[in-house]
Swiss-Prot record:
Protein name according to UniProt: Leucine--tRNA ligase
GO CC annotation, single: cytosol
Record organism: Azobacteroides pseudotrichonymphae genomovar. CFP2
Swiss-Prot/TrEMBL catalytic activity: tRNA(Leu) + L-leucine + ATP = L-leucyl-tRNA(Leu) + AMP + diphosphate
Subcellular locations according to the entry: Cytoplasm
Amino acid sequence: MKYDFDAIEKKWQKYWKENRTYQVNIDRNKPKYYVLDMFPYPSGVGLHVGHPLGYIASDIYARYKRLKGFNVLHPMGYDAYGLPAEQYAIQTGQHPSITTKENINRYRKQLDKIGFCFDWDREIRTCDPKYYQWTQWVFIQMFNSYYCKEAQRARPITELVKILENQGTGGLHLACTKEIHLTANEWQMKDEKSKQAILMNYRIAYLSDIVVNWCPALGTVLANDEISGGISIRGGYTVEQRKMRQWCLRISAYAKRLLEGLDKIEWTDSLKKMQRNWIGRSEGVELRFKIKDENIEFMIFTTRPETIFGVTFIVIAPESEWLTQTIISKKKDSVDSYLNLVKRRTERERISNRKVTGVFTGSYAVHPISGETIPIWISDYILADYGTGAVMAVPAHDSRDYAFAKHFDLPIIPLIEDIDISKESFDIKEGIMTNSDFLNGLSVKQAIQKVKEYIKDENLGKIKVNYRLRDAIFSRQRYWGEPFPIYYKNGIPYAVDEEDLPIKLPEIDKFLPAETGKPPLGRAKNWTYKGYPLELTTMPGFAGSSAYYLRYEDPHNSECLVSSEANEYWQNVDLYIGGIEHATGHLIYSRFWNKFLFDLGIVAKEEPFKKLINQGMIQGRSNFVYRIKNTNTFVSYGLKHQYDVTPIHVDINLVFDDVLNIESFRDWNSEYKNAEFILENGKYVCGWAIEKMSKSMFNTVSPDNIVNRFGADAFRLYEMFLGPLEQSKPWDTKGIDGIARFLKRLWNLFFENDVLKVSNSLPLDKELKSIHKLIKKVSWDIENFSFNTSVAAFMICINELTLLKCSKHSILSDLVIVLAPFAPHIAEELWHLLGNEATIFDSQFPKCNEEYLKEENVKYTVSFNGKARFILNFPKKISEENVKDTVLKCESSKKWLKNKIPKKIIIIPNKIVNIVFD
């Protein structure tokens, strides 16, 4: 019987669907295991062969866990809101609701063809009102909560109102936008608008006027992780800094817990390091400075308090709240000019850029200890929302301050004895202090402790732990996103009633963003709630993905996000697979949301993802043509060095073995219709490179074509065979032929002359050894995510069983079960051909019997007077007398004995023979 992968795969995909093979429910008789993939953006071009890599790995693991007796939750859905979906709709001139639905249908067909064990009854789409009702609900909870630093948890805002009524802000230790000092009487005297403004200072979801990354072309605010090199990752548009009123989430309140939680989860060290750096904990001192001749004080945070006597200037951020109070009139024009320059640079550019820029405000600060005057400058290397937005510059001991001082010819005072700062600053925290008043002669470590005590005793500031992590900007001036459940009454924002959720995204004709920043929802008719205007911005792309893993646990519950029964059973995700590029975006936002919901008692576990695997990238092999500059002439690869050329990506489908199909190339792009070509040996040879697989590089390979040609099982096995899961590796379609041949050999093992040949005879020792060697290897590989070596092990086992002409039912049954997680279709078919009626995934993964793996021969090290000389192989069951006799008769022994008679022969069974002689 011929192996017809197409018929087999369609047959079993239909069977699994009709029999709901992968539908899962709470079963308290089984241990649970929750496997999750980062759900995809349903883009217009569909999946390429790089996308399913992580999905296949998680599918193998989920199937394996099911075969090991676990009740496995393995769902899938679509991250359908946000920029990717909206930009595709704009490019195609269609409404995003239409394109998103079409794209989801395309993805579903592609995923189904690969044969995943997803429980599609639990599918979610972030653009579905039944889903985003709960995104809106979580936002309302954040709006109605504040964060108590003493309790280290979120509390209801109504509780804070009662505290303010009874005691004001005295003695409170709360996460806030800025410190407010208020008595109970002062609170009681406030009107409603003032009270709401004060509460906004503490809400976890709050409104604030902040500097944002504004992209005019996209018409929206972008997060830092959505920008690279000053341009938007999506579309490649220019980004600038702009102050806007935005909704924010107070993730900074959770910085300490986010940092501590990293020690409790199984994530890679590299990913944990990325999050630790992003959170950025630092210990230091917050010092109080005064502006000369003004009754104005401001605080500066420093991690180097011992350098206080080396401060020669102060630098404040261009967005600093103290900016207007420090600029003197004659400096206003130069400051304004500088601010216009800075706004075109993103935050990351400002941090990474080494070019020194700045402007003097004309004002001076007073040194808190010496009383000396210190000039106040503005520079874009200072960020407004890190620390206090101002630094005390100590150029002798900080490289950026040093560069600034050198550029503007400002004083540099060394504070460590016997150092050379003629060319660079001395940043090392060691040495003996000098030029430091009462700190002179102390070591740096001693000086730090002494100056901290002095600052505390003299009330010059306070000891403080600071975090780099900043609050998440949550507003987007776009259409395709979750509407905020917020309305405005007399200009004051209020949450809508929970029973009125969801607030559905309205249908509007013109959804394109405006460069002015006016949101598209401003065009919606009757966009009101009980007669009051609703919020016009929408939530960002990460809103729908921040708690989606919880909704999978209880997707049809109309009463709550997730029931306590469902969450207590499924708890958090046991295995999460996705890209490391989400380290400081989705992965940190999800941890924050989960901790907030944990505070509310909604979830049982504080961390959302126990174990996280970051799959590597499947790279594409790109091809290039070379156009001679300022012409429409293309020169072949081997001749390009003779000309001044520009390399241009070309669609790999127009190239075969790096030779360009010229006529197809002309038809591909009208610009090249009349192009001329300089050939080598009558051919146009293209260049090539291994790069990220991307439609912009025309190097994508569709999994549909591979599955149609070789089958889903071959595709799944080949993706795993390419290399270790966590490493990047290039795609090469030619390599899949070997996998296809392997599956045919597997199939032929079950047949002889097209007739099923299966015997119930007892298996041979060699057959048992081969299959149990495979069971042991594959079990270890799956548990350790080493799927590529499993594929090699399958090939070895099939070759061994083929040589043995194995047809034993017990051996073949174990073989197909072990193979089933990797190649489920052929395994299911062979399983039923072996006489089984239920799905193979209701069987049990076989256990390795180590007895079958014991070697038939053992190696003895032969020693003379304790010195090892050579090794001999013996049958495992040989007697000690036979070992002794064989060793003494061996020619090598005669060489070392030299006709001497052994005094003693010591034998350690299966290991050593030691011959003792004089």
